[in-house]
Amino acid sequence: MLNVMIQLLVVSLAVACAAPVLAAEQTHAQIDGTGARIRMFGQNGVGIVLYKDAVCTATYGEKVRASGSLGSAFGSLMGSVKNQAIGIPETQNTRNLHERKMIGSKPFYKEYAIEAGKPVVVEAGASSPAYWTSTPGFKSGWTCGPLLASTFVPEAGADYEVALDLDFRNSLCTLAVKRVAADGQVTPVDVAPVSKDCK
């Protein structure tokens, strides 16, 4: 068990050291106005993936797991995960990030440079682990059901944010894709549903 914890710590430190270099590289496309940027919210129990240059999840140029990896889950659980920003204006979601907090699940966001004019797919899901109680015994965890996925084509110079909004009372999950204006105001993006088999 100690070896596993040490390995997780080493991986977390390596990722933390690489993050500033990646952020510096990603901002270049946005500075010259030809690229776009996207902010993705995550936390322990929420998986969210970005597929670049894709209209489905089977064929894509690059797959970026913003949340749902072992490293991000561990960082969220321990409360050590940090936001990774490349300059997208603040929104209500970033200012009120604490409202997404759950026990053992610190919310965070990561921002990425994306190519304008090339479609992207965002895919997300959420679940909690199963657990045991004295009565009635084994209980399955909470889940959104099937993964939610949407596709859209980013515009040059535009900023976007993607979040999986969870409504536990009504057992409802919504994949919210919004465009971020320079003043931080957001508007919904016209997205299309995604097919896994690219047909």
List PLM regions with ranges.
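A cross-family signal for key residues in well-ordered alpha-helices
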Residues: 12
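Bacterial N-terminal signal peptides that target proteins for export
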Residues: 1-9
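Short loop/turn and low-complexity linker motifs enriched in small/turn-promoting residues
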Residues: 23-143, 149-151, 161-199
